[in-house]
């Protein structure tokens, strides 16, 4: 008996009770029936449960420098004397820019770029995509927009790339479906185990086939020479993908010694190797917009008690307080901060070097992190 049948019977009984109430017992039964009818009416009118949608969450990426995202761009008051970057704009066949989700307000639609890569969707714990950024959050750019796909774990990369675990093909299906509103897919898998290089190539081959007419761009780590058993064999990847973006940055990083994010000499060697492996029409050289800082001495650490006791002695700490019996103290030290960054001048000098070497396409990581003057010195070939 379904919900509707039960309600009809209860309504009939309650109607009879109302028309011929005899004593308190019948009145009580009538009242109970009426209450049941009301409750069941509400329950039966509840619509079917909608399909569950993964809530939008922020995903930290190792590829992205940590930064606080301001609410909107502001006019800059430069802190140091400026050097003009060039007399005439540099022209490239294509200029790609990456945009992180959450930086939409920083999207400069008037900037001279030919396509945008929207960062991004990530593989979750069980081998499926966590979420996909919505293209409709972007304005109508009248330019191609790529979806960026990442996998931020070496062990997870192994499980989704090695076909024996049966996760690769379902993931490819998800990626193809996620790319439907976009013009192409940008694969940024930076944590591939050494033994999975062959599996990565197979993954790209199957993915490219399933994408059909959609473009496939693959990000690869910077190299200055061929490495044995490299998981990013430039030449082989270029035979599969429509283009390769060489991430020529992070020469120095947060845990290394201070230095350039991408020095000119290092970038020159990276480009020389890339040009020897990848056809010019498929090669994209990536440039950084961001900078990094380093602080010396590095004081965030764990201590053994004897070492900590020596530190307190050296810094003349004699006052130690307790909170719930646990000792703590504070002291001041002088720190030295080193900052290496890029402005319009350094970015354009690096871009000019690439152009002089025969590079026809460049990409920037990422919009919203740049010196805004940089756009005055770039243009896309008509």
What are these regions (language model features)?
Residues 73, 287-353, 374, 382:
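Glycan-binding loop/region signatures in secreted carbohydrate-active enzymes
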Residues 350-382:
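Acidic/aromatic/glycine-rich contiguous surface patches that form carbohydrate-binding/processing clefts
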Residues 86-102, 108-112, 120-264:
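Chitinase-like catalytic core of GlcNAc-active glycosidases
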Residues 25-36:
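Sec-dependent N-terminal signal peptides
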Residues 1-23:
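N-terminal secretory signal peptides that target proteins for export/translocation
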Residues 51-109, 150-151:
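Boundary/entry segment of secreted carbohydrate-active catalytic domains
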Residues 41-42:
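C-terminal motif of bacterial Sec signal peptides marking the signal peptidase cleavage site
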Residues 116, 187, 244, 285, ...:
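Conserved, mostly hydrophobic/aromatic
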């Amino acid at each position: 008996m379904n919900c509707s049948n039960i309600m009809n019977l209860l309504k009939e009984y309650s109607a009879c009770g109302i028309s011929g109430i005899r004593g308190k017992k019948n009145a009580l039964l009538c009242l109970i029936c009426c209450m049941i009818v009301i409750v069941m009416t509400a329950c039966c009118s509840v619509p079917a449960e909608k399909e569950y949608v993964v809530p939008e969450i922020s995903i930290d990426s190792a590829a992205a420098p940590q930064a606080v995202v301001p609410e909107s761009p502001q006019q800059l008051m430069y802190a140091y004397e400026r050097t003009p970057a060039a007399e005439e704009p540099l022209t490239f066949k294509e200029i790609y820019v990456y945009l992180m989700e959450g930086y939409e307000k920083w999207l400069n639609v008037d900037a001279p770029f030919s396509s945008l890569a929207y960062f991004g969707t990530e593989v979750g714990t069980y081998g499926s995509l966590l979420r996909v950024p919505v293209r409709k959050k972007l304005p109508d750019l009248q330019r191609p927009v790529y979806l960026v796909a990442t996998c931020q774990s070496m062990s997870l990369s192994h499980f989704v790339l090695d076909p024996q675990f049966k996760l690769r093909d379902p993931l490819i299906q998800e990626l193809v479906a996620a790319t439907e509103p976009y013009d192409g897919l940008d694969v940024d898998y930076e944590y591939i185990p050494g033994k999975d290089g062959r599996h990565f190539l197979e993954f790209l081959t199957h993915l490219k086939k399933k994408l059909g007419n959609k473009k496939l761009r693959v990000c690869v780590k910077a190299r200055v020479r061929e490495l044995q058993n490299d998981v990013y064999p430039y030449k082989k990847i270029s035979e599969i993908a429509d283009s390769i973006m060489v991430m020529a940055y992070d020469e120095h990083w947060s845990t290394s010694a201070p230095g350039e994010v991408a020095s000119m000499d290092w970038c020159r060697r990276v480009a020389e190797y890339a040009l020897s492996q990848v056809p010019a029409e498929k090669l994209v050289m990536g440039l950084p917009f961001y900078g990094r800082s380093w602080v010396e001495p590095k004081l965030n650490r764990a201590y053994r008690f004897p070492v900590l006791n020596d530190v307190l002695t050296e810094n003349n700490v004699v006052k130690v307080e307790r909170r719930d019996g646990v000792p703590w103290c504070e002291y001041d030290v002088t720190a030295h901060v080193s900052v290496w960054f890029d402005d319009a001048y350094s970015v354009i000098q690096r871009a000019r070097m690439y152009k002089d070497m025969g590079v026809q396409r460049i990409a920037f990581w990422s919009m919203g992190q740049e010196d805004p003057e940089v756009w005055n010195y770039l243009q896309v070939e008509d």
